[in-house]
Amino acid sequence: LKEMQRIVKSVAASLEYRGVFSVNFYVTSTGTLYVKNIEPGLTSIANIYDVTANVNQYEEQLRSAVGMPLHVITPLQIGLLMVVRNYQSRAIQRQWLLKNNWQFRFFNDVGDDDQAILGFVWVTGGDNLAALKNQVDDTEVWNDQA
């Protein structure tokens, strides 16, 4: 995490850009960290801040655009963002009824493609990331990658 933060700070200092951006990483099985890409602007994935921190990307983008100081980001809780695809629809509907620490956002008509993104699930709560991962794994929703 510290290396990721160092890289993001280095990228931010190097860019002549004002606004929200994302740095996406790839980690190999040996633990080597690579920058996958840099995305300027708002992203769906950054919505995780809505439920895990004291800021959201939309307000920070506006503050940046008008020259206001940005908030100091304070983590409020840990969280996972899970992508839900069409083929997982039935399985995720069951979890919707069962999980009180999951938040769901579904998209309108995504078509018939099984791999189309149906929505996102934010899994939050507690301070134990391993416990959240286990909760997700126990559902087996993401085990069957059709």
Segment roles from a protein language model:
Residues 26-30, 107-109:
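Short beta-strand micro-motifs enriched in acidic
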Residues 30-32, 51:
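Contiguous C-terminal substrate-recognition/catalytic subdomains in enzyme active sites
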Residues 33-37:
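Protein kinase-like catalytic core scaffold
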Residues 23-28, 38, 121:
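Active-site and channel-lining beta-strand-loop segments
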Residues 3-22, 39-87:
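Active-site "cap" helix and flanking loop/linker of ATP-utilizing ligase/carboxylase catalytic domains
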Residues 62-146:
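Peripheral (often C-terminal) accessory segments that flank ATP-dependent C-N-forming ligase machineries
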Residues 2, 6, 127-130:
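Generic alpha-helical secondary structure signal
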